[in-house]
Amino acid sequence: MSIEVAVAAALFVGIIAYAVLGGADFGSGFFDLTAGSSRRGAELRTLVDHSIGPVWEANHVWLIYVLVIWWTAFPESFAAAMSTLVLPLLLALLGIVLRGASFAFRKFSETLGQARLFGVIFAASSIITPFFLGTVAGGIASGRVPLEGTGDRWSSWVNPTSLFGGVIAVGTCAFLAGTFLVADAARSGQARLADELRIRALGVGVVTGAVVFAALVPIDHDAPTLAAGLEGRAAPLVVLAALAGLATLVLLWRRRYSIARLAAVVAVASVVSGWGVGQYPWLLVDEVTIVDAAGAQATLQALLVAVAVAVVVVVPPLAYLFRLTQSEEWTRPDH
C-alpha cells in the first residue's frame, strides 16, 4: 500500500466513524420530529436527550478529523469540492449550527412555546444536515466536481445520485438511531416505549433498505464509474450491507436489541465502505486519483504520525465516554 492510499484510508475511516456515530446522533432528530404532541412525545424526547446528551458534540470530532486530513493531504481536491459544492456544504453547516444551538436552548426554554420552537428546529436540522452531506457525497461520486473547481453550483448536487445519496443518508441515520434508542429504552426499563420504537425502527429499516438498492438503478446511468465499482470490487460490501441490514431487522423483531445495534453498525459501515471502495482509485471521480491528488510526501508522513498519535490520545477517552453512555453510571448523583 502506498503512503497516499494509506492516508486516504485513514481519511475514510473518519468518514465511516462520522457516518456511524454522527449518524446515530443525527437520526435521533427524526424520532424527535415524529414523536407527536408535547404530551404524547415527552417520554421519547426525554429518551433522546438522555441518549445523545453526553456525546452529541463529541461526534463532530470525526467531521473535523476528516476535513483536516482532506485539506492537508489532498489540498487541490479539497479546494475544488469546497468551491463547486459550496451550497450544500453551507446548508449542512447551517444545519449543524442550528441543531447544536436549538438542542441546548430547548433545555432552558422559559415557555412551552419556546421549547416547541427549538424542538422543531432541532429535529428539522437533524434531517437537513445529513441530507445535504449525502448530496455532497453524491456529487463527488458521480464525477461532477472538476479539479479546477469550476463545476456547476446547482447540477453538481441536484442530480439523481446526489438526491438518492441525501435520502439514503437520512434513512441510515434514522435506522441507526432507532436501533440505538430501542436498546436504550429497553435497558432503562421502558418496555412500552421500546416496543413502540421497535416497530418504527423496523419500518425505517425496510424503507431505507429498499431505497439503498433502488438507488443502484439510477446510479448505473448517472454515475457509471461508481456503478462499475459497486458491481465489481465493492460487490462483497454491498452483499454484506444487505445481510447485516436483514439481520438487524430480524434481531429487532426478536427483541435482541444489543446484538441488533452491532448489526446495524455493520450495515451502515458497509454501505459507506462500498461507496469508498466503489470509486477507488478516484478521489474526485473521473477527475483525479488518490495518488495524483496527494500533497508532498513529507506532509503525508507527518499526517500518518499525527493519526497514530490521535489513535492513542483521542480514541481511549471517546471509547470510555461511549461506554458510560451505554450504562446508567453517568446518571448517578455521585457522577
Enumerate the predicted regions with their spans.
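Short, membrane-exposed interhelical loops at transmembrane-helix boundaries
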Residues: 284-303
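Juxtamembrane helix-loop boundaries in multi-pass membrane proteins
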Residues: 43-64, 89, 115-129, 191-204, ...
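N-terminal signal-anchor module of multipass membrane proteins
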Residues: 1-58, 64-67
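Helix-coil boundary and interhelical linker segments in multi-pass alpha-helical membrane proteins
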Residues: 1-11, 71-86, 141-162
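Long, contiguous internal "core" modules enriched in hydrophobic/ aromatic residues
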Residues: 105-260, 273-274
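Membrane-interface capping segments at transmembrane-helix boundaries
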Residues: 251-258, 317-332
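Membrane-interface helix-loop-helix modules in multi-pass inner-membrane proteins
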Residues: 55-126, 225-232
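Alpha-helical transmembrane segments
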Residues: 7-19, 82-95, 123-127, 157-174, ...
